[in-house]
Amino acid sequence: MIDTTLPLTDIHRHLDGNIRPQTILELGRQYNISLPAQSLETLIPHVQVIANEPDLVSFLTKLDWGVKVLASLDACRRVAFENIEDAARNGLHYVELRFSPGYMAMAHQLPVSGVVEAVIDGVREGCRIFGVQAKLIGIMSRTFGEAACQQELEAFLALRDQITALDLAGDELGFPGSLFLSHFNRARDAGWHITVHAGEAAGPESIWQAIRELGAERIGHGVKAIEDRALMDFLAEQQIGIESCLTSNIQTSTVADLAAHPLKTFLEHGIRASINTDDPGVQGVDIIHEYTVAAPAAGLSREQIRQAQINGLEMAFLSAEEKRALREKVAAK
């Protein structure tokens, strides 16, 4: 189901949601951090979704063990590097990795700015070794409040040339986008792209707000757009992309099952929607699974899957020249 003549992308992928269980085990031992299990087999149920979680917030707690072992900046650098290695193993040509430095720093009071630097270093080294093209998206974790998001924003701005876009993630219901208007004004002033998690836990009004008030060019998840025909028309007309994450939306109980997922309808409506992983380490999936198992189960035809793959590159925060070069590089292989 993957067209090997086209670039394969993953543009909604959380770096801090893709920490290998083996790495959690090794870092726990290295830093003498008490873990809920002492073998890989017994640790996996604590760090990966085995059965669907009742809601988004419950799902997010599965990420916590991954960041609890980030006891040093070297550990942050390692997981960033391994994210690129994983992308290469999955056959990805281009990946946009998003991360919340405040979340990664929290367990061991690491300097937020240091975490940003460590992630940049790890990703840069991974790209050099594995040949994957990558860009970084800074996440503000809305769950921790406006002040914490401000701290994350300042850390990103200090290295603004290494950051491609700003995102807002976390508890969408408890912390609506209206709390973060000034943050996104500064992001746009910095020349960054904007993508926002919206329409996952909250309704279509959250998506409208992300677009109209925060300046979103893309929407993360966006499943609730299906409830608003005018919104779907607007997304299609304005070419505002939806970063779909099929398995994730089932595991968070955002959507009942794959057959009920709106991605197929979005594509039929002419919306620029793509296929992505979200938190592959926590979900126990990869991009290949999403294309070859999840997408067909969601009712997508072979041509719709190909269109979603094309959309992934068209939606990417790359220049027209960068997109052309990537297409030519893949076609020449």
From Swiss-Prot:
Binding site for Zn(2+): H12, H14, H197, D278
GO biological process terms held by the UniProt record: adenosine catabolic process; hypoxanthine salvage; inosine biosynthetic process; nucleotide metabolic process; purine ribonucleoside monophosphate biosynthetic process
EC number: 3.5.4.4
Active site residues according to the UniProt entry: E200
Broadest EC class assigned to this enzyme: hydrolase
Keywords: Hydrolase, Metal-binding, Nucleotide metabolism, Zinc
Protein name: Adenosine deaminase
Gene this chain is encoded by: add
